[in-house]
Amino acid sequence: MLLTGKAHHPKSCPPFFFTLGLSSPFSCAAYLAMAWYWISTRLKQRELSSILLLLPVINQAQASDFVNFQSVDTSLYMQFENRVDPRKTISPILEAFGDYSVGDMYVYSIWQNSLQSDYTGDKSTYYYKLVPRISFSKVTDHDISFGPLKDILFAQWVAKTKSMNYDYFPGISIDWQADWISWLRTIFYFENNAKGSWNDQRIHIDYGIPFNNRLGDFRVVGTFDYTLGLHGQPETIDFKPELHYDLGKFLGNQPGHLWTGIVLNPIKNKYKIKDTPYYRTDQFSYGIFIRYSFF
């Protein structure tokens, strides 16, 4: 979910998802091998092998006309003042994005671990989701963009949380365009959640806004989710803005790869659990992260 820029030759660096270019004191292949081994070893133990098997298959498709662009990001987040979950957590995250001849797909996986020694619940959990989208413009080979409207897509949100059934949300996505944004998407989902019923609806917004000043290159990226709270459920608001700073460029390396920054995450009725004086589910958490983007 980042900016597009100079790519490395595919023979020297695997072409994956979300990024710009690459320059580091060690080779991309070595970094990828170490990161992939570390993540796969742990996530496979947690029933996430399907995600891990998916990415190499996508990578092999790079040589065909089906793939326009793809990249992968790895990151490490420390989060504080959570509610429901452990108050302090550390979480390795793997994200991927691909642009294809018929649409695009976003993949996200997180392995969350407690840093709170007195937490009595599950100290480790995982969550992953796949969001494939089919583009009306690409399928019909007809550009429907007009003014701020860029495209209309059919979207699907397939997600899994540890010890829970799958969520499946089909929806309609509207992509927007403007000179000052990298991307802006609005998606309306019908929720068929882990309880196995079509009992809610969701509005999802995600965005990327780059800017720079005398301190360097920045971007604001994030998501906003609002569930309507149908059929007696509490409405939920989940806002997660992040401020990214291009640390790699500051250190003299090629821009667009090594990032650091802060994240805020105010939530109302977290996990659709009604906030009460006896059990608080409204939160305002914050955190820091380091992130590496590569092809």
Task: Please report, for each region that a protein language model flagged, where it lies by residue.
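Cleavable N-terminal export/targeting peptides
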Residues: 1-67
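Short glycine/proline- and aromatic-enriched beta-strand/turn motifs that initiate or cap beta-hairpins
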Residues: 62-113
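Short loop/turn motifs that connect adjacent beta-strands in outer-membrane beta-barrel proteins
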Residues: 64-70, 102-106, 136-153, 177-185, ...
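Transmembrane beta-barrel strands of outer-membrane/channel proteins
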Residues: 74-80, 107-111, 154-158, 186-190, ...
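Solvent-exposed loop/turn segments connecting transmembrane beta-strands
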Residues: 83-88, 114-124, 159-169, 191-201, ...
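Membrane-embedded beta-strands of outer-membrane beta-barrel proteins
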Residues: 94, 130, 170-174, 203-207, ...
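Outer-membrane beta-barrel transmembrane domain signature
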Residues: 189-259, 265-270, 292-295
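Outer-membrane beta-barrel "beta-signal"
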Residues: 282-295
